[in-house]
Design a protein with these regions (language model features):
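Long, intrinsically disordered, low-complexity segments
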Residues: 1-26, 126-136, 167, 172-253
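Flexible, polar/acidic helix-loop-strand segments at domain edges
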Residues: 1, 9, 25-138
């Protein structure tokens, strides 16, 4: 996760200088290389209603402000770089710099053997993996699944109550029953389960893959098609099904 989800701050250049050392096991993201850049919808849009109150969006959880390592740069241009107000020469989002969720790494807490200099938190070339325990089941997700079921039964009061168990823990504003929709639940899943859930499986289960990609992810929206809501059936499975005709899913040949 760290390798894919954290930015490659090594490549940040501003005023002809690099503000950061790399790889460092702090909130700059360890040994990230920026393959999975957060969308603007994920890093900004879904937090707008409670940007500063929701603990899940605090800077130690969703990192937007990065402490500068280069003392000369800090002296001239400031000791932090903010993705919401990037300095001269820095494009956000791009692989070198974007807002990311710190749970993809272990700031200041990498395994001892990965430090080339433990005092400065400099990492060696063997770093890049994630060493936090990964969740298989989450109570929060159980509440969100039940909220989804209540919504399907048109019981928005109970759906809101389940969502608010999670939001209360995160010190976020409670949601009103009138605000609960399937899209709201999907947003709450992003806020709570970002970098954790198998998002495509969730969206395909709900029949919302196409709609959400078109709404939230302009990069993939360019080539998104409706029939991607289902996977193609492997030809060998169709061929092996001799008892009856197994039709390929629409849109695939």
């Amino acid at each position: 996760l760290e390798r894919h989800h954290a930015p490659v701050v090594r490549d940040v250049k501003s005023h002809g200088m690099n503000p950061f050392s790399w790889p460092i096991g702090d909130y700059t993201g360890g040994r990230g290389i920026g393959w999975a850049i957060s969308t603007q919808y994920f890093s900004d849009e879904i937090w707008k209603d409670d940007f500063y109150g929701d603990m899940r969006n605090a800077n130690h959880n969703f990192v937007r402000k990065f402490a500068v390592h280069n003392k000369e740069y800090a002296k001239l241009y400031g000791d932090t770089i903010d993705t919401q107000n990037p300095p001269v020469g820095v494009t956000v989002p791009s692989r070198p710099l974007y807002a990311y969720q710190s749970k993809c790494t272990t700031p200041y807490n990498h395994p001892e053997g990965l430090y080339s200099n433990a005092k400065t938190y400099a990492l060696n070339s063997g770093a890049g993996a994630t060493y936090t325990d990964q969740y298989m089941f989450r109570l929060a997700e159980t509440y969100l699944l039940r909220a989804e079921a209540y919504l399907e039964l048109n019981d928005k009061d109970k759906a809101a109550a389940d969502i608010n168990v999670i939001r209360d823990r995160a010190h976020a504003k409670p949601v009103l029953s009138s605000q609960v929709t399937l899209d709201y639940i999907l947003d709450e899943r992003m806020r709570e389960l970002g970098v954790e859930e198998r998002r495509r499986i969730t969206l395909m289960r709900m029949g919302k893959l196409y709609d959400r990609v078109m709404k939230c992810n302009p990069y993939y929206a360019k080539e998104m098609e409706k029939h991607y809501e289902l996977w193609p059936i492997p030809y060998k499975e169709i061929e092996a099904n001799r008892g009856a005709v197994l039709e390929q899913n629409p849109g695939y040949e």
